[in-house]
Amino acid sequence: NTKAKLKNHPLAHLLSVRPNEAMTPSVAKKLTHCNILLGGNGYQIIVRDSINARPRELIPVPYYSIEPFFDTSGKLWYLYTNPRTGEMRRLNQFDVLHYKAYSEDGITGISVLTRAQETISTARAAQRYENKFYSMNAQPSGVLTIDTSLAKEAKDKVRAEWERIHSGVDNSFRTAVLDLGMKYQPISISNKDAQFIESKAVTVEDISRFFGVPLYKLGAGKQSYDSNEQNGIEYISGTIHPYISQYEEEDSYKLLFDSELSRGMWIKRNM
């Protein structure tokens, strides 16, 4: 039941020093995780030694450049399209590290933005509503009335002149001067409309829920515990650990040989 770090293992340098010629391990990890969060899938192509098939390079690629598919026999493959050249290659599933966000089929992940689309659309609508509301000096629309009838051209002219003088923050608190016989009746804002404007404030909580990040880390809400250590443990177990577990499982299965797995070897990431 003892555990030992294999510092001289051929994968040690690849994982902790240089995964490929262009990137450090931290850059490769951040790039891959960014693709998971924004695209639902993080991919790294495994370049193997032509003689012993040992992984020689790990190359992160954009989530949109790879598409999983099954052949007629039911075997899983990955179709890779080079973003620079347009060249297409079919890759064996064991030559692609595939990390997923939430998935409905276990093959393709769904991005946070896709799952949050409805809420984001509502928040954007609330933002546009609020901008329009305050561009009108935070005043609801109203009705100008006059005892006599006006032609359409005359109505448009009166409306345009009124909005020019009284709309906008810069025209706040200006005194309205009405022509003889003209009256202005404001239309009060409903409680429902007021709540819709305030709804924009809950989007911070939405972001917290979508990404699984505690509210206090986004500058809102309170910490769950008085101890920073306990809050750190909660963040690791609730937010980080689900991803780390997936990384370790995928890395161990595809980077180690079957003979190594049978001897109890596995790849563990530091947290």
Residue ranges and their predicted role:
Residues 260, 264-271:
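Basic, alpha-helical terminal appendages of large translation-related enzymes
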Residues 137-139, 220, 262-264:
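Short Gly/Ser/Thr- and Asp/Glu-enriched loop/turn motifs at secondary-structure junctions
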Residues 185-261:
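A beta-strand-loop signature enriched in Asp, Gly, Thr, and Trp
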